[in-house]
């Protein structure tokens, strides 16, 4: 599975960036994942994302449990969807799906970090591995 995660808005604080890098490292045994932040959506490199299934993370999106997210990833794999673009911080971009981390508004860095943590948790579930050591 290949993921591109685009965070749109204010700068992501260093401590969140550090946490995201840690989750990228942990996720590397399950998938390929990149993280990029942009000041606004006009700067997004959409030209190379036509093949990607696009998901917006928004408080107004569909809420999933960790197990449901794991099941969604499994469905993607079974249906041949291998390239996924996650957009955090801009709810107006047209996408295939809209998911929610929480119905509460959070900072861009916190939302991004929680998304990475939940993706990692979903892969641990899919691989029948314990999450906590």
Give residue spans per PLM region.
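Acidic, metal-coordinating catalytic cores used for nucleic-acid/nucleotide bond scission
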Residues: 11-14, 60-66, 92
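Conserved strand-to-helix beginnings and helix N-cap segments that scaffold or border functional pockets
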Residues: 16-20, 66-70, 112-113
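Structured adenosyl-cofactor binding patch, chiefly the S-adenosyl-L-methionine
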Residues: 91-92, 96-133
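Glycine-rich beta-strand-to-loop/alpha-helix junction loops that act as flexible
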Residues: 86-90
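Short, Lys/Arg-enriched, disordered terminal segments
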Residues: 1-5, 81, 132-133
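A residue-level signal for conserved active-site and pocket-lining positions in enzyme catalytic cores
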Residues: 5, 55, 115
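N-terminal beta1-alpha1 ligand-phosphate binding loop
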Residues: 1-24
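S-adenosyl-L-methionine/SAH cofactor-binding core of RNA-modifying enzymes
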Residues: 28-85
């Amino acid at each position: 599975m290949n993921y591109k995660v685009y965070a749109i808005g204010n700068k992501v604080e260093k401590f969140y960036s550090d946490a995201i890098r840690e989750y990228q490292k942990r996720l590397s045994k399950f998938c390929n994942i990149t993280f990029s932040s942009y000041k606004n959506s006009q700067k997004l490199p959409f030209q190379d994302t036509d093949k990607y299934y696009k998901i917006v993370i928004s408080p107004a999106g569909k809420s999933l449990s960790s197990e449901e997210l794991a099941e969604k990833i499994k469905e993607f794999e079974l249906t041949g969807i291998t390239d996924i673009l996650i957009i955090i911080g801009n709810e107006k971009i047209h996408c295939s799906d809209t998911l929610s981390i929480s119905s509460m508004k959070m900072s861009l860095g916190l939302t991004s970090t929680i998304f990475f943590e939940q993706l990692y948790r979903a892969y641990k579930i899919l691989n029948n591995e314990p999450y906590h050591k």
